């Protein structure tokens, strides 16, 4: 059987960069990873709760964490940051307070910055979240996958592959369904590939969503 490798880790240092930028001693490295996970989880939960009262679709492309001796800088890249930008600094301050409640550190300050993604439908995390919402609303998985491919045309991507695995449509036997449009050269290191894995809970069980996007070739 073919051996699969994560396309992001495969290209680190070539055309992909780390989303956590900090150094730590070997004994405290595990604690630093747990800190990052708590910060990311808290931000995602806050955005998901505010999605219900917001008219637009909110999607986090990625969260970058930079740690210094006295500062933790969090940069959130969001596709449609309506409730955070339209509310001025109030939305960002409220988010920062929520994160600080879970993250206690007397020696380091926490600073959160929001950046808008230029082409949100070229981000696999945002597209995976869109498919998850469609599946929860019992939309046909084929219709959801085709709609995602239509959305990526707005972002001028060179290729996309979408895969859904699990008990699709409530069938007794789990299976894998996928669709591809354009080129997705996973084995070419100079080809910049964005990838994400997303888990969604439906009434039939847990489904796994994977998306590969061919952005450009260097």
Curated annotation (Swiss-Prot):
Keyword check for Methyltransferase, yes or no: no
| Highest taxon of the lineage | Eukaryota
Q: Which InterPro entries match?
A: KH_dom-like_a/b, KH_sf_prok-type, Ribosomal_S3_C_sf, Ribosomal_uS3_bac-typ, Ribosomal_uS3_C, Ribosomal_uS3_CS
Q: Does the keyword RNA-binding apply?
A: yes
Could you tell me where this protein is found in the cell? Plastid, Chloroplast
Which positions are tagged coiled coil? none
**Segments forming domain KH type-2:** 47-118
Q: Which PROSITE patterns match?
A: RIBOSOMAL_S3
The entry's family comment says:
Belongs to the universal ribosomal protein uS3 family.
Q: Kindly provide the name given to this protein in its UniProt entry.
A: Small ribosomal subunit protein uS3c
Q: Which organism is it from?
A: Calycanthus floridus var. glaucus (Eastern sweetshrub)
